[in-house]
Amino acid sequence: ATYLSYLPKEDFRYPLRVNSDSRGKFVEILQTSHSGQFSFFTADPGITRGGHYHHTKNEKFIVLRGKAKFRFYNLLTGETYEIVTDDQFIEAVGTCRGWAHDITNVGNDELIVALWANEIFDPEAPDTIAKPFRDLRLRL
């Protein structure tokens, strides 16, 4: 905190890298060595993001704007679970290891979701394994 108080005013703000594709934007806000990574993403109506699972990573999502459907699929048992939430009821939705998950914008406006992950993404040892729900023959 003392160090930060001596930063020049020009360093009070700084640009963030925006990763954009057809699904929307993904922005990493902050990476920490002990507290994980903080990010947010966007999705237009009808767009699904995710479609993967993790071996070690835990994630928490908060819908800041819009309405989202979270779908989960247990890789061992085949059990499915679904949560629909929106910006009118602020709650955290967590993922669990061994469950594939995706998030769909089921509202009429842009979806904005804040995301915390317990560990920083490591391109040398990625822990995001693609498992699109269309490959699981789900009836969701």
Per-region residue spans from a language model:
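C-terminal substrate-binding subdomain of Rossmann-fold SDR/epimerase-dehydratase oxidoreductases
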Residues: 1-25, 135-140
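A short glycine-rich, His/Asp/Glu-containing loop-to-beta-strand
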Residues: 12-51, 57
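Short histidine-centered beta-strand/loop micro-motifs
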Residues: 28-29, 49-55, 62, 83-85, ...
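Intrinsic-disorder/low-complexity, polar/charged segments enriched in Ser/Thr/Lys/Arg/Asp/Glu/Gln
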Residues: 36-38, 48, 67, 80, ...
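Residue-level "contact hotspot" at macromolecular interaction interfaces
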Residues: 42, 62, 92-94
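Glycine- and acidic-residue-biased ligand/ion/polar-headgroup-sensing regions
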Residues: 56-75
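Short acidic-glycine-tyrosine-enriched beta hairpin
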Residues: 74-98, 102-104, 112
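Double-stranded beta-helix
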Residues: 77, 100, 104-140
